[in-house]
Amino acid sequence: MVLKELRQKRPLVHNITNYVVAQFVANGLLALGASPLMSDAIDEMQDLAKISDALAINIGTLNERTILCAKEAIKHYKALNKPIVLDPVGCSASALRHDTSLELLESEGISALRGNAAELGSLVGISCESKGLDSHDATTPVEIIKRAAQKYSVIAVMTGKTDYVSDGKKVLSITGGSEYLALITGAGCLHAAACASFLGLKKDPLDSMVQLCALYKQAAFSAQKKVLENNGSNGSFLFYFLDALSLPIKLENSLIKEEW
């Protein structure tokens, strides 16, 4: 299992992430078994690319400086053939986010694209609402994820009540998880960083992303059980979730289904 190897090798994951979630992402990676590195200083991108195993780019608090930093980082990680995960946070909400996401994808250095239905849909020309597919659009999540993977030659990861992962040839779904993931800030941001940590091991990328999604959902479900047992809520879920990520997690293959 990929998680066991991750905890043995502790890959170094460089994060260019948003300032709202940086601490949570770093703690989540540590809990999972990876080593976080948080930096958006343009002048050190070349040096950090040499020592890191993977890069996670999150555009949650986008600005001119972080855009330039992301471009510089991609250039150096691409030259070293190291995996890069892009989390196009809110790219369906503004022209700046959408155009920046497209520009980063067109660099052809992105290994995995991770987002929700609205974000991935907007990047392949399909209108979706943040709470699900637009009622006027008959396109399924399977079609969206497949198009994203094929259009950008990436492993596409769509998270939600059901997660979907595709390499453009296959589409797999992963069920489970917890509704609390949508009630805390940073669950998706940490998920993208965790994707980078798994890809940093240089195993089969499709299988690695499927395993990560399943393990993430299992940890969330475990945390939810603790919350309910202790009459907790959002705040306690956050801490129980970090605990669950740090404990042994047995991969439940029953959560995984091949869709296409």
UniProtKB/Swiss-Prot annotation:
Record protein name field: Hydroxyethylthiazole kinase
EC number per UniProt: 2.7.1.50
Domain of life of the source: Bacteria
Cofactor(s) for this UniProt protein: Mg(2+)
Keyword Transmembrane: no
Task of the protein: Catalyzes the phosphorylation of the hydroxyl group of 4-methyl-5-beta-hydroxyethylthiazole (THZ).
Pathway, per record: Cofactor biosynthesis; thiamine diphosphate biosynthesis; 4-methyl-5-(2-phosphoethyl)-thiazole from 5-(2-hydroxyethyl)-4-methylthiazole: step 1/1
Family designation: Belongs to the Thz kinase family.
